[in-house]
């Protein structure tokens, strides 16, 4: 239900409409007291709503029961372009990775769509879905609770492969230049169906702001099997979790994204084996990276928040031949085998908040800098990293540049439709022992034994910065910006 275009909060009890109380976790607690309730008998459906002092007869009140706004009736509707629409108000269902994922707009297990220059908002769950179909399994855990979620999903992957899940039939979508907001599960999600796609230049915000429910599928962008997917130059904020690459993010490149004001973290990498590349990003929330994977490469990022390093020995997840959906094997996450080159790590404003945070039971380490990887089974490759304001380096890191007495104070300021980053990196930036990042430097991810390369198999190099400015191959600047000034900076980042 909507009042003047703004969705009300659904309640499961009439009492909470008659006597509403603010939802404690909502990011707009005042709005959370505008509530509605529905009940039915054999003949009628009754709707109750609390509009406070506003007379609904004098305002626009809308009721919506549609499961989507634009969604094909069957899989395989390929090569459709959706451009220039304003789409809003859909009663979408929860889009689990083992289910058919129906969004406000969705591709329904197809190939080659272009979704661009649209404004998409107010989905009960997901905005855009690039997900799988019904036939490969639909909420399979509800019919067999004797198996754990990883087993169910591995079986879904096997069924999808038998049904033709491949570059030839699925994925290769382009999602660009859209504005997506007011969705309570994801801005963009896709289980298996987003392979080989490009998600670029989207503004995704106000995701999971009501917080009436939670779950393991909530983010600005949430993908399972981001195989050879490019996620570039997106602005993701006020989204709970910014990006979530869950299972099989092999060959993915996550580059040049702006993330801030995300209360969970900016990016979560879950049970991926590599190779994948995370470069030139601005991770400015209080928790920058949650890493429950291995085999990743992180280069030229600005990480202003904490890092979490976790193992996952209980789940066995797929890895693949290069640039393929075929499964080469299954294994768990022992941790490490990551590469960190030319990054900027910013510590806390108070030294006490960088005290070691170690949970022996879950093998989880949390803190500012790469020390959280010190105990991991597989070593890191490192070089050219700078540690500010108490952020701590990896124990075995050679030539780390530590500037504990300098706080860059990265601050985001929104001015109309533009976003500016204020920070001070100091004159010591040029002292970092940096290296030009290439396929040769990064080597091969241990588990799949594959190189970090472009989706077409050609060697890659990080030859441009966040703004597209050419990098100095002889001595690139650490961080996302090539040759920034030493004084206080004001950079237009969106």
Per-range role (PLM):
Residues 14-29, 53-67, 100-108, 113-114, ...:
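Short, charged, low-hydrophobicity "junction" segments
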Residues 248-249, 256-258, 262, 268-425, ...:
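Extracellular beta-rich repeat passengers
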Residues 78-91, 111-125, 137-160, 167-186, ...:
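Right-handed parallel beta-helix
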Residues 42, 65, 98-100, 168, ...:
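Short, solvent-exposed coil/turn segments
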Residues 64-70, 97-106, 124-166, 182-191, ...:
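Extracellular beta-strand/beta-solenoid scaffold signature
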Residues 188, 197-207, 353-381, 476-493:
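C-terminal/domain-terminus segments
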Residues 1-109, 121, 129, 136-165, ...:
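Extracellular polysaccharide-degrading/modifying enzymes targeting complex plant/algal/animal polysaccharides
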């Amino acid at each position: 239900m909507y009042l003047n275009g703004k969705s009300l909060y659904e309640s499961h009890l009439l009492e909470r409409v008659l006597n509403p109380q603010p939802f404690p976790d909502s990011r707009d607690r005042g709005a959370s007291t505008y509530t509605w309730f529905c009940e039915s008998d054999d003949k009628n459906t009754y709707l109750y709503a609390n509009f406070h002092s506003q007379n609904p007869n004098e305002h626009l009140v809308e009721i919506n029961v549609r499961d989507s706004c634009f969604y094909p009736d069957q899989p395989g509707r390929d090569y459709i372009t959706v451009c220039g629409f304003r789409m809003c108000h859909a009663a979408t269902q929860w889009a689990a990775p083992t289910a058919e994922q129906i969004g406000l707009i969705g591709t329904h297990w197809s190939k080659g769509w272009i979704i661009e220059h649209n404004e998409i908002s107010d989905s009960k769950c997901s905005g855009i879905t690039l997900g799988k179909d019904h036939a490969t399994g639909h909420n399979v855990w509800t019919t067999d609770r004797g198996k754990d979620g990883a087993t169910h999903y591995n079986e879904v992957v096997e069924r999808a492969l038998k049904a033709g899940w491949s570059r030839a039939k699925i994925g290769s979508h382009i999602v660009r230049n859209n504005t997506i907001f007011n969705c309570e599960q994801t801005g963009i999600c896709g289980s298996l169906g987003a392979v080989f796609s490009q998600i670029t230049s989207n503004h995704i915000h106000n995701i999971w702001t009501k917080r009436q429910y939670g779950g393991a599928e909530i983010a600005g962008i949430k993908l399972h099997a981001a195989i050879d997917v490019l996620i570039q130059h997106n602005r993701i904020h006020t989204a709970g979790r910014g990006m979530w690459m869950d299972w099989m993010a092999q060959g993915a490149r996550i580059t040049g994204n702006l993330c801030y004001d995300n209360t969970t973290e900016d990016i979560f990498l879950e049970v991926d084996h590599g190779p994948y590349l995370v470069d030139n990003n601005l991770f400015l929330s209080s928790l920058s990276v949650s890493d429950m994977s291995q085999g990743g490469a992180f280069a030229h990022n600005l990480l202003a928040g904490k890092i979490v390093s976790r193992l996952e020995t209980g789940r066995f997840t797929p890895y693949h031949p290069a640039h393929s959906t075929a499964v080469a094997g299954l294994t768990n996450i022992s941790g490490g085998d990551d590469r960190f080159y030319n990054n900027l790590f910013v510590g806390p404003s108070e030294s006490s908040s960088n005290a070691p945070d170690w949970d022996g039971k879950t093998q989880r380490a949390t803190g500012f800098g790469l020390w959280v990887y010190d105990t991991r089974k597989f070593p890191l490759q490192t070089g050219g990293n700078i540690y500010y304001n108490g952020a701590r380096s990896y124990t075995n890191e050679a030539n780390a540049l530590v500037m504990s007495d300098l706080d860059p104070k990265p601050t985001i300021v929104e001015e109309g439709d533009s976003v500016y980053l204020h920070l001070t990196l100091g004159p010591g930036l040029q002292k970092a022992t940096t290296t030009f990042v290439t396929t040769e430097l990064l080597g091969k991810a241990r588990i799949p034994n594959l190189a970090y390369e472009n989706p077409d198999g050609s060697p890659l190099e990080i030859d441009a910065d966040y703004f597209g400015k050419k990098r100095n191959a002889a001595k690139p600047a650490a961080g996302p910006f090539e040759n920034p000034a030493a004084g206080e900076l004001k950079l237009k980042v969106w």
